[in-house]
Amino acid sequence: MLKTPLKTLLDALTHHFTKERLVTLILTADEKLLIFMLEHENANDYKNAFFKMIANTLVFNQEALLECLEIKELEKSFTRFKNKIGLFSQGGFIKSSELVVLNFPFKDNVLLGNAKDNNTKSKELFYHEILHKKEIDTFLNKKALCHFEMHGEGDLENALKDKNTNYLIKGNNLIALHSLKKKFAKQVKCIYIDPPYNTGNDSFNYNDNFNHSSWLVFMKNRLEAAREFLSDDGVIFVQCDDNEQAYLKVLMDEIFLRENFVASIIWANKEGGGKSDSKHFRQKHEYIHCFAKNKEQTIIYGQAVEDIDRYKCSDKHENTRGKYQLVKLDSGSLGWIKSLDYPIELEGKTFYAGGDYDQWLDRQNGKARIKDWGWRWRWSKEKLEWGLKNDFIEIKENSNGEWNIYTKQYLNCDSDGNIKPRTLQPMALIEKHSNTQSNRHIKEMQLNFTYSKPEALIMDILNFSTNENDLVLDFFAGSGTTCAVAHKMKRRYIGIEQMDYIETITKERLKKVIEGEQGGISKKYGFKGGGIFVYAELKEVNLEIKRQITNANSASECLKIFKTLNERFLKRADCKIDEIDSEEFQNLDLNEQKRICCTSLDSNEDYLNLGDIDEDAWEIDEITKKYNEIFYS
């Protein structure tokens, strides 16, 4: 934290140099300006705010000082737009451009997002990235963990030392991400999140009443942090509905870069005709935007063939290749290529793609309209020779007495002869796995959560993007579907959830998974239970006190809790207890008294910084300190 407020530092500069002259001095890195700051009585604060260390050398950060000065005057801050939202380029709003960034109110802020339950609709706290840089650094420092629990066989200490351990963390997900990012940076293969959709209602168990700009800031902060977790070949899937999906896509273009966009998957999530609560179109789908950390290194895995009844034919290779189906070698819809339009002589017969010699001759002589008669073979001459040699080709007469060449498409062998289950390239359309299925599953587990995602949907996503033992992250863990599916599919996982139901729903669900519950994808994967996860919570400080104040039943109880606080908890140095003792305060209703007491507490200290864990005031026991040391080592 700065000992001197930024406003004081800026006022000293503008008083000494004048505002107009100061801008020129900053742009030219004038020696007089640098000497003034470095020899000032608040030199350390000037260094912390407007200089940075590069290769052990103190370097003047002109941009930081300029931005801070300009924001002080409210001339160039994004917040000047207030309620305007649009696409922004080269200093102004635009309708279209090759290069765009999403512009929205409070873009240069960090939104804490401290919802704890559905019933509390609190005003969310913004921190400005420039004017509150030090405050941001403080609340995004590593936080101490507490209430460690081991679930499954084994002991907690060894689990914390094991890099393959699964984790379920309770706490604000933005702060948790920043606490965990150094430990898990560049290790996560797949991130899946199902954030609040900004629907303006309580259709599921989130404090889902952000306004548009708040929601965008909320997502921006978390996506920027999440990107640091992804491995170079990692991918992120973000689920959304029509309320924000278009803005979310452009926001993700900015954070992950447009060239790393993979797909916008459509999931038909409702059975039957969909919801009819719109006067225009029925809604029965949601979106899942997928981006890669580096698209050049990312592999999207194919889906296993489900319609195996089509594979009816058998030959001498069945034990290794499995059964097969026949697929005609020629095609009229793949686009004509002259080198793939050649005559084939087999078993005393000559074959032409499309079956017509005259059309073939016209194609060769340039007389045919290729778009009408663009037949050709799917395999080259060399590939055909390989297929004949390795028994991948079959000639067969159809019911009309016509002979055709077919390739054998085996169930357990690819077209290059590699023995492995056949897969299909996944489609960006999922027309299965409804919310009805997931709601039924949740009820079977005797858990109370609305609109949990079906396990089969998350199974598809993890099949697209991961292999066994890959690490999966979900920082909107909700009812724990992602963690449960990862557990059953032998993936490692980290789940983060700040809502209080993590203890009664999310954690309880994962305990049932370890016990071997048979809903969802359990039977498909032959899952019988087992495995472990570690539960822990970010250590609350002011959050715990705020909760006590909120739950107080009387004004006297509220004041008693507040008055026992050490002065370190107070948000402002000029906040005086005697003002709370005033008659004016006493005349306020209880809820207003609670609000004033809670807002007087510094949100920087909602959670305990790891660096402060040894201070006696926090009364952290030695075993908890030890577990933190092991976890963060």
Residue ranges: model-predicted function:
Residues K72-L471, E503:
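Class I S-adenosyl-L-methionine
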Residues A12, K19-E135, W379-W386, N390-E402, ...:
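Coupling/switch/interface segments within P-loop NTPase motor domains and analogous charged loops
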